[in-house]
């Protein structure tokens, strides 16, 4: 369950959130199971945040930093993650259906069991990712950099 204080700061907007993150770098935000559907989190620093089972459907996360974040079982259906950073993120069993991931960096991420059906990952990077049972049906993988998995 999400920490209500963390949610309250996030709801003040990205500028307030990012300032709070700079002031409290030791805190690992807990936004697990939060309903952030349709939220505008573009450019947000969500690095190392716990977003497990969060509802981020149709959220705007372009250029957000989600490095090392826990998005396991999160719903990101229809979200915009254009040029987002998801380096070493835990994305296992998350739903990325119809998501805009153009130019997103997912290097080192764990994608096992994730659903990327119909997603656009063009121009992004999936180097050294765990892809076991990941569904890329009808996804756009043009110009994606994919090197050996772990």
List each language-model region with its residue ranges.
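Tandem repeat scaffolds
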Residues: 7-8, 16, 21-150
